[in-house]
């Protein structure tokens, strides 16, 4: 916000906010109006002057009560050359502070990226913005910023060093167990290609680590283990059998790897598990869950089926639940974890999320020397009875 105020000799508050909206949901002056933030910026930047005069608050912040700006999304004209100057300055201060936070150990790259999105309203984390525009453009912006605003921190490491981290998955060692936490709460911990690649990377790195006896996979927060897979790629593959089959294989890399692992993996369901998220969970060697969690394969509502194991694995692992699985897959029927426990699908239920990881680690110890594997023999699946008049809501099909 202070840097935005320093641009008022070049542009209006509304123009600056409009340029900022490429990266944030609300521009700096709009936010200052909402929070009565001018005195806050003056006080905080005055304190920061202990680190250098470059942090001095813009004088205009002491002279204005409210800013003449627009609501986010309004059509505001900004000439291209002016847009570039504003953009460079705003990204310059963002990148400078991001490098400084990482270099001084104030926060991890993952926490920085995550916090900017969930707490500060960024569309993408600053390190994702850097990745999108590329190393050459980041270097150009930082060189320009150093010339315009000397004194602010510059990067001390290579571009690749700042990009080498897991964006969506937390990895913690707890009593010789690797706890993997899916952290995309803004998307209900939905899976995408990067999430599955990060899970696989952690597992592969620790598979031969003698200090790690097994893995627990859980979700961040209490709302969802994982609400499924991002479906953004699905439309472009509709009707293309070859591309669809290959994408299903690619999405199943984690599951296929777990099938052959010598160390056990326990899914700790902290909340909703749907679609691709449930397919990851059922491929783990055991499941524990909170009592109020819901499991569902909603794919049929999109005109597709669970394509990375959901149509096969449940029947092979828990044949006694075949009739229930028919309803889940063909009708999209949600079930509670108590229903899953009744058929042996969930091995242990706990009352609260606080008890979940301890239960998962106990379950890991229980199966450690005899990891359950997916049966390969033929299983009997009861016939699915199609209703006489299939309905989609009130619409007869």
What do the PLM-derived regions correspond to, one by one?
Residues 175-183, 193-242, 252-270, 290-294:
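A structural preference for short, pocket-lining loop segments at secondary-structure junctions
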Residues 1-176, 183-186, 194, 234-241, ...:
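N-terminal glycine-rich phosphate-binding loop for ADP-containing cofactors
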Residues 274-328, 359-361:
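CoA-thioester-processing core
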Residues 268-274, 328-334:
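Glycine-rich beta-to-alpha transition loops that act as phosphate-gripper elements at the mouths
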Residues 19, 268-269, 298:
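Structural motif
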Residues 228, 245, 252, 275, ...:
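Glycine-rich phosphate-binding loop at the start of an alpha helix
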